[in-house]
Amino acid sequence: MDLSPYIKISERDNFTIYSYPKKYLELFLDELFYQKSIEINDDHTFKMSKNGYIIDNFNKESSVDFEYLRQSQIAVYWIHEWYDYLIKNSDNKNITFKTKLIELSNEDIESLFNFKTYGIIPESLLKIIDDSITEINNLCFVRTDAYSPKDLVFENKIDNLKVSDALTAIKLITDSERCCQKLFSNDQIISKYLAIREYVNLDTNYEFRCFIYNWNLRAICQSGFEYNSELHAKKKIIRDSILKFWNKFESICPYSECTMDIIYDNNFKNTLNDSCIMVIEFNSFGPHMNADSGLYDWDRDYILLTKSNQPHFLLAEKPLNTI
């Protein structure tokens, strides 16, 4: 389990003993164990066989594939799980960016793999993607419903992610190791949707991560890690706008626990509660999943992220040597 949040305690011939996050115990157990009727060890540990299956209390390999359970929980937050629900319940407000979801058949996924290898793609798939781009308004951002190809930007392979034709869109997806990971891997949970999303040129400094636990907004932090004087100057305006958004959004929030990425722009029109806030995406919650905690720390800030009565708001501060 690469990059596992679980601590390896010891390794035996037939299994490995891991400890799981004690501070997020209830959430962890509910998602990964209770639903499958797995008994829990009193010492906060579980045993995993060499094949990746949970060992029961009789030291027998169960049929419960641990990483499959974890990945299936992460997949609950993919775009196709929440987009239509938000649009249906947003009362015709601009709540997230216009998106066209294209469900991929096994044949389509094979065609994308063949394009990555041989550079050939069926005209029928090109037409479906081109039609979706036209429907969105000709300038789009493309991703799988699991991941975006932002690794290409981080690696300086491209300047931005906007596309206006199907061939460019397919090339971005198949060039991105991040996207290919969930399209072509041997994982039991793979992405079966392309998401053609409206491309809007926005200031990413105004992106924020919201932490929702037990249906309550507990904390908010800027998505970036660098000090931004403009954000500090507008701190109250931004915080008030996010709370104004949440005042209406909490009744339709699709998840009891999640991290929610949003963006603020005072030029946004017809937003929920006139908040100038739009939802970008949802991700999982807790150190046992795959979403990071931004400026917070899952362990150190456990009480704040799960029990805060008033949403905590955090911006990056100046490094001490520059003050």
Swiss-Prot record:
Pfam families: D123 (PF07065). InterPro entries: CDC123. Signal peptide: none annotated. Belongs to the CDC123 family. This is Putative CDC123-like protein L884.
